[in-house]
């Protein structure tokens, strides 16, 4: 009898469990789970409560990631808790994860369609993303639920704020659209030669209106692109690049990534800046999102090849191997384009519309000449300037140095090169000006520049009194043999026995006494006159180290000054007697 009743009792027990929605462990089970092929969804409110407590503690201490993990566990323990979805959504928003937050709001509203706060939060997220239509619809549903609850006339301040912001965004976008049409019309007319320069006030208004929209809706892609365009019209290319960078984060664009790469690498970058690295990173991002993109792959190969040559040149430059620098910059093959030529061609190509594109990579609204403004070319021109100067080939150095100074008037290397040329031309005023400028730019701490400045100052002083080279009619760069030949000729012509004056002969002998001695000539070329008893004693003239800074420098300068030169010198000016024959 008992054995017969047992199966019936088990069947009855199972029926009751199904009816009550209980599992064998006493945990609530959704009854409809048994009606489907899916495994039953078990709910454990006690465990869920524990995870919620952990999540709330994490939220209060700003540990949003820990809070999210706890919310995930809470929802696993109790998937029917719509309030937990709401809390997790707010944590997602704190981390900027708007898409995940919107999904949580959707899950919440399936469980509790009348939870008005979820619609308000949805409206805020949609507005931030610039989706005005969805924001408006969410607000409409929010107002409808509030009306059902009898609270239509007591709208919270938060809801009113969303409404006013939505109105401002819609109005600004409409005005911006009209303004863009006017700018388009003016630009097209300008290309045909029928209009003057674009109205600057309208361009400013474009930037202002777009800025107002983006304060509220930073993810509004179209407005960000419009502002970037107006920034280029204003000549603010780096501000435009910031907007394009944000745009490719919102929606990957191979074209914009190539544009950013060209501008970052070739135009706005400076030596050692992050822009150079960004130039390659933009192309890597393009190939990551679109591995088969031929345009990005081609540009990536080109820049990698350039970087290989540039790395060589930079290494030689830093090790002061200047002939090797020039060799590295000649390019990979003899007779082919140089590295500078390759860079100029890359920039020029970027100003033209390429196959498959609708506009050039460097916008037609770009103000100025991107070749002249290229930061990469500035670096290479500086290398050429320095290398040729160090190799004492000023004729080749100066064209590059002038290009550097045109873009960067305070460039130390180019200023030093110009000073060196001035010294060679015996234009000591210019040399002193340039060396003073370079010394100031170095923070007045570069001893090599300071030494050159002192030499130029001494030469300037000597040129205003005695110029032995001029006396003999020779150049500072002439050889000893040439100087000796000139001396003999002048001595014959000006000897008192031949009708010359004693004074003129004394000047010739004095000049030869210095220039005919290699050691004395070197001293004179450094700005010290061996025949001047006070030679070298310039006190603090142009010397920041003369007082207080480096006392030993002053001591050595004084030692060099007394006596004029080793061995006592010729304090009164030595008289040489020339014998004919």
UniProtKB/Swiss-Prot annotation:
<keyword id="KW-0843">Virulence</keyword>
<dbReference type="InterPro" id="IPR036869">
    <property type="entry name" value="J_dom_sf"/>
</dbReference>
<feature type="repeat" description="TPR 3">
    <location>
        <begin position="116"/>
        <end position="149"/>
    </location>
</feature>
<keyword id="KW-0802">TPR repeat</keyword>
<feature type="repeat" description="TPR 2">
    <location>
        <begin position="82"/>
        <end position="115"/>
    </location>
</feature>
<dbReference type="Pfam" id="PF00226">
    <property type="entry name" value="DnaJ"/>
</dbReference>
<feature type="repeat" description="TPR 4">
    <location>
        <begin position="221"/>
        <end position="254"/>
    </location>
</feature>
<keyword id="KW-0677">Repeat</keyword>
<dbReference type="InterPro" id="IPR019734">
    <property type="entry name" value="TPR_rpt"/>
</dbReference>
<dbReference type="InterPro" id="IPR051727">
    <property type="entry name" value="DnaJ_C3_Co-chaperones"/>
</dbReference>
<feature type="region of interest" description="Disordered">
    <location>
        <begin position="522"/>
        <end position="544"/>
    </location>
</feature>
<feature type="signal peptide">
    <location>
        <begin position="1"/>
        <end position="19"/>
    </location>
</feature>
<keyword id="KW-0143">Chaperone</keyword>
<feature type="repeat" description="TPR 5">
    <location>
        <begin position="257"/>
        <end position="293"/>
    </location>
</feature>
<dbReference type="InterPro" id="IPR011990">
    <property type="entry name" value="TPR-like_helical_dom_sf"/>
</dbReference>
<dbReference type="Pfam" id="PF13174">
    <property type="entry name" value="TPR_6"/>
</dbReference>
<dbReference type="GO" id="GO:0005788">
    <property type="term" value="C:endoplasmic reticulum lumen"/>
</dbReference>
<keyword id="KW-0256">Endoplasmic reticulum</keyword>
<feature type="domain" description="J">
    <location>
        <begin position="467"/>
        <end position="528"/>
    </location>
</feature>
<dbReference type="GO" id="GO:0005783">
    <property type="term" value="C:endoplasmic reticulum"/>
</dbReference>
<feature type="glycosylation site" description="N-linked (GlcNAc...) asparagine">
    <location>
        <position position="293"/>
    </location>
</feature>
<dbReference type="GO" id="GO:0034975">
    <property type="term" value="P:protein folding in endoplasmic reticulum"/>
</dbReference>
<comment type="function">
    <text>Endoplasmic reticulum (ER) protein that functions as a co-chaperone for BIP1 during ER stress. Might be specifically involved in the refolding of N-glycosylated proteins.</text>
</comment>
<feature type="repeat" description="TPR 6">
    <location>
        <begin position="378"/>
        <end position="411"/>
    </location>
</feature>
<comment type="subunit">
    <text>Interacts with the ER chaperone BIP1.</text>
</comment>
<dbReference type="InterPro" id="IPR001623">
    <property type="entry name" value="DnaJ_domain"/>
</dbReference>
<dbReference type="GO" id="GO:0051087">
    <property type="term" value="F:protein-folding chaperone binding"/>
</dbReference>
<keyword id="KW-0325">Glycoprotein</keyword>
<keyword id="KW-0732">Signal</keyword>
<dbReference type="Pfam" id="PF13432">
    <property type="entry name" value="TPR_16"/>
</dbReference>
<dbReference type="GO" id="GO:0051787">
    <property type="term" value="F:misfolded protein binding"/>
</dbReference>
<feature type="repeat" description="TPR 7">
    <location>
        <begin position="412"/>
        <end position="445"/>
    </location>
</feature>
<protein>
    <recommendedName>
        <fullName>Tetratricopeptide repeat and J domain-containing co-chaperone DNJ1</fullName>
    </recommendedName>
</protein>
<feature type="repeat" description="TPR 1">
    <location>
        <begin position="48"/>
        <end position="81"/>
    </location>
</feature>
